[in-house]
Amino acid sequence: MLTRHASGDTHLSYWPRVRQFAVPPSMIETATARRLAGDWAGACAAAGVDVDLNPRSVARTHGRELAARLRADLRHLAPDLLRWHLPRIAPDGLLRPGLTISLARYDATGQPGAHPVHLVARTPPAWADAGQRISLTLWDGFRGAHGFRGAHGSYGSHSSYGFLASHADAGARRHPHPHPSRRFRLDLHRHLWDARRTDELRTRSGADRPPGGDGPAPAPDPLGRVPQGRRCAVDRWAAEAELLLDADGRSTGTGAGVVTVRFGARRRLLLELVAAPDGGGPPALRITEAPKGSHASGLPVLPDASTWVPPDLELLRAGAIEVDRLHPLVASALVPDRPDRPPAGPPRIPDRAGEPRLVECRGARHRIALVDGVLSPLDHDPAELRREELLAELTGTPMPCLRAIDEAHRHPDCLTGVRERLDHGDIAGALAVVEGLLGPEAVLRGGALRDELERAAERRITYGLFRAGLIGAGPGPGPGPGSRGRPHGRRTH
């Protein structure tokens, strides 16, 4: 989720644009078709996911049973849905960089001393985030020789043990945070990526209840401690904390236990589940400030996906988005009784191909449109155009029709949309907008549009170098190689 603002509903203004550009309909359509055809690797490719694992090598290393469970999960992985739900940062809604997120945990059976294996998704560091690519790999521990340290709890200890394969080893070494995050994890939220379980989103998100519905009432008044202006899923915290304690092997059988919930780097709360006196009802939830010190850091962390009301549910309740603009699997889960409709097409883009545009030119309305794949004036003969182009070179003042074409090349009205598509990795969508405006045969002139496309290409090279391990650990705090110098967004919470 994106960073929340104390001003209340400010975040609702940019989530619709995130939903418009981050996972385009063409990606969803292609990835879904390949997944339904049984081509999980092809679905990943369509969704911008780089696969860094080999199920055959998993069978040799960890046994056929674990490999079979992995293959079943890969067949039902909806990578476009995973991209839809991954944590994002404000203000642009880009993927939160430098994360390793556990999607599934496989406990080894019949192998004494074997450590759990995690299917993980990784996002690259911010300086190498061109294309908003995601990598999919396996993780079975930490290697002390590379200086990696384990996390507390179920995600490892300070012991040293090996990686699955050389490629995963290299990927972990070049990643800033190679071990699975305790806060950003989806192994307890399989409905956010597993096509078999997407219907669970309705219950887990609270969409089956009105806002502030009939969940267990926290006591005492938690809202005095919960940061104001943030859509915390307080009515789900008790149930989510029970799931967390059970998954991490800390369940007491009575529902009692303690977990932490994080709000950014400096704010934490303790969620204490207090068993009912007679043991016959759900545990009560007591919320207190987390004490400073090591005690709280060793407690289980409520997953980020459990902490907040999902943005799609907020948008629907606020009337800020149409249900047909949501991912189809999300829409069917949140609004199961909606009439069957075809998936929403891509958003309408300005200056559609084939439609002439009107320009006020010397007291008359003239047209400019695509002719033989190039944006051209329609109401001036070739001799007049040659004469006007020569005069423009001498005087620097072209006639309005030529000036409109030049402006379309250098700084078109659609530049913001092109930039957002490039930022989110939708190269094909960005080029479609440009070609719809200027034509497929156009030669770009110097200006902001050409600069954006060139920077996008440079940043893709930077990502390739990062993937290949040829660029070291990356730059310092300043803009990375190929960066267009935009300030990094604030991270979530």
Predicted features and spans:
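N-terminal membrane-targeting/anchoring modules of bacterial envelope and secretion proteins
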Residues: 1-228, 232-235, 245-249, 437-438, ...
